[in-house]
Amino acid sequence: MAISWRTWLKKTIHCDNSYVRTGLAEFLGTFLLVLLLNGMIITAHMSVRNADGTMAHPLNTAHLAFGGGLAVMVAVLVSGGISGAHLNPAVTTTMLVMGRLSPLKSLVYIFMQYMGAFFAASILYAVYFESILAYDYGERQVLGANGTAGWFATYPQEHISLVTQIFDAILGTGLLVMGIFAIIDPNNMAVPKGQIPLYVGFLISSLIFSFSYNAGAALNPARDLAPRLFLWVIGYGAEAFTARGHLWWLVPVIGPHVGGLLGGVTYQMFIGAHYQSDRKLKPATIMDEDDDTNATYNTITTTTHQKVYNGRRNFDESVPLKTVHA
């Protein structure tokens, strides 16, 4: 009997190793995030430039916000069922500290996130090489009228101090992680698994609307540092790191990690720790460590009355009591 190519492919390359599966998912998810997000930024800049090099009109914040939200939504849709779609080292670090991810797997996640972002920057540069050439006339510039480095990495406004840059990154990423915790918390609004990517996309759009002016919404270390390294490799030079101050490049790397931890702790202190004991459920969502049960948002053990929450807002007393690893 003939088998389909999909069946053959699955039998040929299927891997049961959790580290490999989740690593591949994080690579592809982060690749898509950076590819679509930065591609949208490039399109937004080029669409407001006249043939003579002048700006036809300012950048449309709505374009950037909705484009960013859609990019994240697609990335989470693609990779969420396998790895939980962290796609951000700051999110992974927070999950590690909160006990939702093992130390070794967190290293795999973060490494593959940076790799996916770097590869996305290289593909995007190849796709838009001719357009970038027409934009900057062959002279790679980081900032200025013909600067294109900001299409790949974040740079603050000239008048923004280092202290404000740090506060901006911490606050923005703190709100990001707080929002993610609320979305994936089955004790809260119990967002269905299939709707999680949509709500995370809305969250990103809201943050870009609110925190993109100072420094371009520096919320993701992988999305920022990996493309910045690519810029340095292809000829933008050390200025890719030193523009707007020699310390700026560290802000989008360190700040989001601090902000993510603060956001996660804040959510637990103000919301997560205050559910009534008779309705407290054990979180197991697509943002948790990969597992055949929790990665697909299956079931969550509740009380000894053998009522099992199945992710669809109903209880089934016929399901045997079991423990779900989160």
Swiss-Prot record:
Bilayer-spanning residue ranges: 24-44, 64-84, 107-127, 166-186, 196-216, 247-267
This protein's encoding gene: AQP3
Glycosylation sites recorded in the entry for this protein: 146, 294
Subcellular localization(s) per the UniProt record: Cell membrane
Locus of motif NPA 2: 220-222
Gene Ontology terms for molecular function: glycerol channel activity; polyol transmembrane transporter activity; water channel activity
Name of the protein in its database record: Aquaporin-3
Single biological process term from Gene Ontology: polyol transmembrane transport
Motif (NPA 1): 88-90
Native species: Milnesium tardigradum
Family: Belongs to the MIP/aquaporin (TC 1.A.8) family.
Domain note: Aquaporins contain two tandem repeats each containing three membrane-spanning domains and a pore-forming loop with the signature motif Asn-Pro-Ala (NPA).
Any one GO cellular component localisation term in the record: basolateral plasma membrane
Lineage: Eukaryota, Metazoa, Ecdysozoa, Tardigrada, Eutardigrada
